[in-house]
């Protein structure tokens, strides 16, 4: 099951095998899967029941709710950084931008290589890669917005120091942290 999941999702998300067994036990208890025996190599074989198929169809048909935003470590890091004196928020933003652009290049290359290979089953991996690319592009745009907000805030505080950004625009270069907000 783990291998099949990884094949279908491009092994993007590691699957905790212990969680798989716990989930299979719960699915069996709820009548959504049934044990069929073993495969001769010590692996239990499960099959999906009619109720399980109906549950999967319901899951596919239901939109993914965005009521509880997922934990975003970067957003938390920046939110904390701007509230603490002495933290160079600009450096955090720049380091993340470099890492995000590197990831974006890797994802784009993987998408190009996968599209060129034209192997069966690549469509699922291409969908995952497209999602990762769009998320990373959005992160870079968000980092640009964070930087612009921090610069605007520093300028509002009346600082006169200047620096050049990656796109050549001269902006306020006061260290971007909670001290610059006061």
Regions found by a protein language model. Give the residues of each.
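Amphipathic alpha-helical dimerization/coiled-coil segments
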Residues: 58-106
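Heptad-repeat amphipathic alpha-helical coiled-coil interaction surface used
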Residues: 90, 97, 104, 111, ...
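Long amphipathic alpha-helical coiled-coil segments
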Residues: 149-165
């Amino acid at each position: 099951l783990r291998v099949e999941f990884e094949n279908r999702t491009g092994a993007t998300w590691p699957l905790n095998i212990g969680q798989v067994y716990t989930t299979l036990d719960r699915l069996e208890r709820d009548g959504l899967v049934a044990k069929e025996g073993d495969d001769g190599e010590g692996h239990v074989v499960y099959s999906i029941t009619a109720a399980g198929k109906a549950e999967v169809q319901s899951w596919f048909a239901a939109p993914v709710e965005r009521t509880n935003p997922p934990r975003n470590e970067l957003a938390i890091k920046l939110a904390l950084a701007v509230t603490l004196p002495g933290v160079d928020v600009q450096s955090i933003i720049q380091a993340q931008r470099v890492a995000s652009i590197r990831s974006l290049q890797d994802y784009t290359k993987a998408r190009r290589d996968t599209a060129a290979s034209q192997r069966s089953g690549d469509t699922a991996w291409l969908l995952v890669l497209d999602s990762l690319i769009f998320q990373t592009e959005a992160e870079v745009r968000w980092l640009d917005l964070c930087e612009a907000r921090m610069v605007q805030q520093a300028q509002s505080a009346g600082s006169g120091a200047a620096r050049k950004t990656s796109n050549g625009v001269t902006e306020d270069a006061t260290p971007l942290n909670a001290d610059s907000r006061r």
